[in-house]
Amino acid sequence: MALTQFENDLEILRDMYPELEMKSVKVEEEGEFPQRINGKLLFKISLLADVNIEFGEQHMLLSNLSNECVEFTIYSCHYPDIRRCVVMDIKSLWISTDEKKMLIDKALRLVEETVDMSIEFADSFTSILILIFGFLIDDTAILLFPNGIRKCLTQDQYDLFKQISEEATLQKVSRSNYHCCICMEMEKGVRMIKLPCENANVEHYLCRGCAKSYFTAMIQENRISSVRCPQCEYKELKLEDFKSYKKMLKALFTPLIPVSFLKEVIDTELCERYEKMFYNQAATRLSKYCPYACVTCRRCDSWCTKEDLDDAMIQCQKCHFVFCFDCLHAWHGYNNKCGKKVSLSTDIIEEYLDDTVTSYERKRKLEAKYGRRVLELEVNDYLAEKMLDLAIKKEGSNLQRCPKCKVVVERSEGCNKMKCEVCGTLFCFICGVLLYPEDPYEHFREAYSGCYGRLFEGMPGTET
């Protein structure tokens, strides 16, 4: 075979595969077929349909793959022994060593089964390469993705496929035309910015100029809720719909436009301003809905948010000050009790307590808002107070509440003029009314008083 015919064959191959490179061609004499041909081809495995990439509970759809590379050396002197004639190596970031060996073996077996080994090598040279390249491009997906699924063995493998998918998407976007939803101009994807819309099934784009001016204006005007895709429908977050406090936190403190995205579009100073305003706005809203969730740090005045509603210990993420949510002093440990910062209303406690009226879902929402442990403690206190009230109202009871601090006082002896040992308040044991400190007995002397003449009523030793 003349060398010019070999060169013609190479031109045919290059026309079919523009990425084909021939590294070296060695000949002994002019006009002879090359004894050794070195080359490589960048190729992309063709996916007939989207494939599922899985790792544990993570999964994603993959539509395109990155370029792989096959390096080959052909020795004409070893023909027709195709195993010695063709030496191949596949370069890939994600195809395993065993899979590479399997693909090469199947490619060579296809050549052995298809090419007529009785003809001259010069006549079969082009056919061999076309078969190998065609197999790698068109027939390997079914082997590497059986049933359209690829199960990753490590997180790194899964992340690699995620990166491949993102790069393939970027390449596709850069070649396509898109409308900016603000100025309505059409531009190539390379000049556009794809917005990170909450709905993954939609694709909205802004040209770089509009993206910068829009987000800059929204932040400068303190319109934090407008820092989002201007084309997507906006739905305000309803905190009362959440049944989990942690899910509420995640939803409330996750911006619709990630700060990492904004850093690629606007100035760093504006990004920092937005991040601070967004967090403060979210924390303020949470503190109004969940009284046990947020408080400002007494050291640096930054908002601090609880990770666990039932935990009184809280740490400032800015200055790292650890303090008690209830008393706002430096953390004193769980065993040293302090006063409650917030008390629940009786209506909330009774609603949580009543299983006949309150549904399971409503209870979960109350727990997401106030904390399960907080509710249980409040319920226990409420029931204890109810029991005390019943004991006080019982006929012949020697118990009464202080009208000021509500502490239960027991009369073991003496008259009906009582003094609270906690707050020092003077009151009538019979009716609970406050007594004048200057003349506490006036209440029992006045004829219009319901306790007139009853100062010693019920006093041990005075029964008649």
From Swiss-Prot:
First and last residues of each zinc finger (IBR-type): 267-338
Keyword Cell inner membrane belongs to the record: no
Residues of the signal peptide: none
Reactions it catalyzes: [E2 ubiquitin-conjugating enzyme]-S-ubiquitinyl-L-cysteine + [acceptor protein]-L-lysine = [E2 ubiquitin-conjugating enzyme]-L-cysteine + [acceptor protein]-N(6)-ubiquitinyl-L-lysine
Highest taxon of the lineage: Eukaryota
Pathway(s) the chain acts in: Protein modification; protein ubiquitination
Residues that hold Zn(2+) 4 according to the record: C428, C431, H443, C451
Binding site for Zn(2+) 2: C290, C300, C316, C319
Pfam families for this protein: IBR
EC number from the UniProt entry: 2.3.2.31
Role description: E3 ubiquitin-protein ligase involved in translation quality control. Involved in the rescue of stalled ribosomes by promoting ubiquitination and degradation of proteins on stalled ribosomes. Specifically required to resolve RNA-protein cross-links caused by reactive aldehydes, which trigger translation stress by stalling ribosomes: acts by catalying 'Lys-6'-linked ubiquitination of RNA-protein cross-links, leading to their degradation. Interacts with the translation termination factors eRF1 (SUP45) and eRF3 (SUP35); overexpression decreases the efficiency of translation termination.
Annotated domain remarks: Members of the RBR family are atypical E3 ligases. They interact with the E2 conjugating enzyme UBE2L3 and function like HECT-type E3 enzymes: they bind E2s via the first RING domain, but require an obligate trans-thiolation step during the ubiquitin transfer, requiring a conserved cysteine residue in the second RING domain.
Name of the protein in question: E3 ubiquitin-protein ligase ITT1
Organism: Saccharomyces cerevisiae (strain ATCC 204508 / S288c) (Baker's yeast)
